[in-house]
Regions:
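Bacterial N-terminal signal peptides
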Residues: 13-27
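Sec/Tat signal peptide C-region and signal peptidase I cleavage site
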Residues: 28-34
Length: 282
């Protein structure tokens, strides 16, 4: 808190009430909240705006209703606006353990990617020149967290990858595109993080249009380009991802084939940067 004197001799309980209402309704934009992060609003947001199991350009994915978010943000105390305010006053140092920290920063990255789209609406891709002329939005300071501004690149590379070094994180961060992993309809939480990340990995890798495609008949395995993009986690590309991927391949023959890279050629699936928007559902 900023230590300013409260006029009128308010009872101690009144300060707590003011803090709660400030967090939820935008009254303490310059102060940092010293409390565990509550994902209730974010879960409501996901329930309202994320639709699972749709198809765009032949790719199955979870889509986002950006049209509705953009329209609703103009309402007073919209879910979207309240979430941004909640992040702005939250101090990440209050998170209690590694799992809570990872869950928080994954959720925050995904909110930031959505905000990138809404801030420049309407666009057909996060790499639209309307966002950045060089088609590189990752350096834009897009979110305020605890009174500090962050870019998507900072959250992904300087925090999630550099600090936690868990490659399963790649299956949870969503860059608002068709070929990226699906936006989970459930908020990530520290107490469930391991199971949530494993579920995300399995779902992504079972999607042959964007995750993994094994063709034993002609000796080719197609990997997602996320294993080529991130040189920090996968310096040798897909070759470095094989041991990570194998446990999530349910078919025994496919899994055994994957584990012997000398018998196949590594190729990469096309990466579709089109927006994962409900308005494009076929």
């Amino acid at each position: 808190m900023n230590g300013k004197k409260i006029r009128g001799g308010l009872a101690p309980g009144s300060l707590l009430v003011m803090l709660v209402f400030g967090i939820w309704f935008g009254g303490l934009s310059s102060d940092v909240c010293a409390a565990p992060f509550d994902y209730a609003m974010y879960q409501q947001f996901l329930d309202r705006y994320v639709v699972a199991g749709k198809y765009i350009e032949g790719i199955k994915l979870n889509v986002v209703d950006y049209d509705a978010i953009h329209k609703d943000q103009e309402k007073r105390h919209s879910l979207y606006g309240n979430i941004l305010q909640q992040l702005a006053v939250f101090d990440p140092d209050m998170l209690q353990n590694r799992e809570e920290e990872i869950a928080f920063w994954i959720n925050t990255y995904n909110v930031g990617a959505i905000k990138m789209i809404i801030d420049h609406y309407s666009v057909d891709s996060i790499r639209s020149r309307k966002i950045n002329w060089l088609r590189n939005p990752w350096g834009i300071k897009i979110l305020t967290i605890g009174n500090n501004a962050y870019s998507l690149g900072q959250i992904e590379h300087e925090i999630l990858i550099a600090k936690y070094k868990d490659p399963l994180i790649h299956f949870a961060i969503v860059c608002a595109s068709l070929s990226c992993p699906d936006l989970s309809p459930q908020a990530y939480e520290g107490s469930q993080l391991k199971e949530q990340l494993q579920r995300q990995a399995r779902q992504f890798l079972q999607n042959t249009k964007k995750g993994l495609r094994i063709r034993k008949e002609d000796g080719v395995v197609f990997f997602s380009q996320i294993f080529r993009f991130d040189k920090e986690s996968f310096p040798n590309g897909a070759t470095d991802a094989i041991l990570l991927i194998a446990p999530f391949v349910d078919d025994k023959e496919d899994r055994e084939f994957l584990m012997h890279p000398a018998q196949y050629t590594i190729k990469y699936l096309d990466y579709n940067w089109d927006l994962n928007t409900l308005s494009s559902v076929q």
